[in-house]
A protein has these predicted regions:
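Transmembrane beta-barrel domains of Gram-negative outer membranes and organellar outer membranes
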Residues: 19-263
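Bacterial N-terminal signal peptides
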Residues: 4-15
Length: 263
């Protein structure tokens, strides 16, 4: 984890010689569009502080590739699996580590959209957690929708999902997970951007006092070329103004995204 933080600082502040390619600013905007027709592989490192009954640090790595599939000259199908790898404190010196539940978001989106891009499709959550404490033990299905507006230096929009349990492990309660992720990016020269993309979540079947997670915050991102490989890096921080009892008080996130634009 220390190595990841050092890489974040060194790459974000690295030598200007790797940023001279003329397409860096265009790639920056593409990296900010969750349904861009470009293969990308983000690695999202989340350092969560104040978790559990003893207010300890937890960590989760979200591996969330984006795979666009061309259906016709007018339509794309965007596939976005999200695989979490978790390490969480349980209190009393105990911890659990392993895979969490896999989320699959998919979107049908027009391929010829310009300044406004939208997409809708099905989403699913699979009970892939390797430990009981790392998942909900439910199979969830529901809709997903996204809208993106791009104008000048701005890339902004929101991604919304809603799931409902359709099956699950005996003895575990059903879930109805909802999430909305608004995102605002203001792009600066040389691939820099000011960014915020908090994810607000709720489970409509949870106790009302433990339903919502509401983070606020933001940070910076930079898109660059290392050799011929486009990368996007982001360093952001969020504070949870409302949250379930044992969720983190605040989070520091370092994201590294490998981009593979069509040639």
């Amino acid at each position: 984890m220390k190595t990841a933080a050092l890489l974040a600082v060194s790459w974000l502040c690295g030598a200007a010689t790797v940023y001279s390619e003329t397409d860096v600013e265009a790639l920056a905007k593409k990296s900010q569009n969750p349904v861009e027709a470009m293969v990308s592989v983000p690695f999202q490192n989340n350092f969560n502080f104040g978790m559990g009954p003893d207010k300890e640090m937890g960590y989760n790595l979200n591996i969330q590739p984006v795979v666009p599939l061309s259906l016709s000259s007018n339509w794309n199908y965007i596939v976005r699996p999200i695989l979490p790898i978790l390490d969480i404190p349980l209190g009393g010196g105990r911890r659990k580590s392993g895979l969490g539940d896999l989320t699959l978001e998919t979107f049908f989106t027009p391929s010829n959209a310009k300044s406004f891009i939208w997409g809708v499709g099905p989403m699913a959550i699979f009970p892939t957690a390797t430990e009981r404490e790392l998942g909900n033990g439910q199979w969830d299905l529901g809709p997903a929708a996204v809208g993106v507006y791009m104008h000048g230096p701005w890339v902004l929009g929101a991604l919304v999902t809603q799931g409902w349990s359709v099956a699950g492990e005996s003895g575990r309660p059903g879930t109805a997970p909802f999430s909305v992720q608004p995102f605002i990016n203001y792009n600066l020269p040389h691939g820099w951007a000011i960014t915020t993309a908090p994810t607000y979540t709720a489970d409509w079947r949870s106790d009302a006092n433990d339903a919502w997670t509401l983070p606020v915050g933001g940070g910076i991102s930079r898109t660059l070329l290392v050799g011929k490989q486009p990368l996007s890096l982001a360093l952001v921080a969020y504070y949870n103004v409302d949250k379930p009892r044992y969720q983190a008080d605040y989070q520091i996130r370092f994201s590294l995204t490998f981009m593979f634009p069509a040639k």
